[in-house]
């Protein structure tokens, strides 16, 4: 037991010593790296200052061109990915439409079989349609005929002149209208009626009473 405890203590002491040494190394390396970077920047500045302006401009232009090329490549890649995505969507839509159309075609033949019409019926259909059109025309003509008759009668009434209330035929002719020869025939029955005795006078003279007076 004592040996185990001693070994554990020794191991912990060694580990602490190693950790302390490593931390010191890192702290020493970090300032060295920062100092190296500062030295590099200074060297670049000196080199840039020694380079003429034309070379600087060319260098800057090349850098800008490289940046533009990189941007164009990125844009092309983005467009390519978008086109691929759209093509995938289009293909998926077409596949769904094809599946729907195939399913509908499977359903439609059963209905078309039920609705099959022979050729004879198809040839007879235009004749039936013509007959129906003729029947409709006749019916329309029959409906219009009474209206035409009424309109014609009204037109005749409007066109006919008003009759005069004092026509010569409405009254008996005056005696001076006829000639003397005609007046003989016209006046003779009147005088005959005045001369002939009535039924009462003949009955008184003959003393014969008619039967209808007896009652």
Swiss-Prot record:
Keyword Cell division listed: no
Modified residues (Phosphoserine): 33, 99, 101-104, 111
Locations listed in the record: Secreted
Regions that span the bilayer: none
Primary location group: secreted
Species of origin: Oryctolagus cuniculus
Tissue: Mammary gland specific. Secreted in milk.
Function: Important role in the capacity of milk to transport calcium phosphate.
Family under the similarity heading: Belongs to the alpha-casein family.
GO (cellular component) term, any one: extracellular space
Protein name: Alpha-S1-casein
GO biological process, one term: response to dehydroepiandrosterone
Signal sequence region: 1-15
Keyword tags: Milk protein, Phosphoprotein, Secreted, Signal
């Amino acid at each position: 037991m004592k040996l185990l405890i001693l070994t554990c203590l020794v191991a912990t002491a060694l580990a602490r010593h190693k950790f302390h040494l490593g931390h010191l190394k890192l702290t020493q390396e970090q300032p060295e790296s920062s100092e190296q970077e500062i030295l590099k920047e200074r060297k670049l500045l000196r080199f840039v200052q020694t380079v003429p302006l034309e070379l600087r401009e060319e260098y800057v232009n090349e850098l800008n061109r490289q940046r533009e090329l990189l941007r164009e490549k990125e844009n092309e890649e983005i467009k390519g990915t978008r086109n691929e995505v759209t093509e995938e969507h289009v293909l998926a839509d077409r596949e769904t439409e094809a599946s729907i159309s195939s399913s509908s075609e499977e359903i439609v033949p059963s209905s078309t079989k039920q609705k099959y019409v022979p050729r004879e019926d198809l040839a007879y259909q235009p004749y039936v349609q013509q007959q129906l059109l003729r029947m409709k025309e006749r019916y329309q003509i029959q409906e219009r005929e009474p209206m035409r008759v009424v309109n014609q009668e009204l037109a005749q009434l409007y066109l006919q002149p008003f009759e005069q209330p004092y026509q010569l035929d409405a009254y008996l002719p005056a005696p001076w209208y006829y000639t003397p020869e005609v007046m003989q025939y016209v006046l003779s029955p009147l005088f005959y009626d005045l001369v002939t005795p009535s039924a009462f006078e003949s009955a008184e003279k003959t003393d014969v009473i008619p039967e209808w007076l007896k009652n």
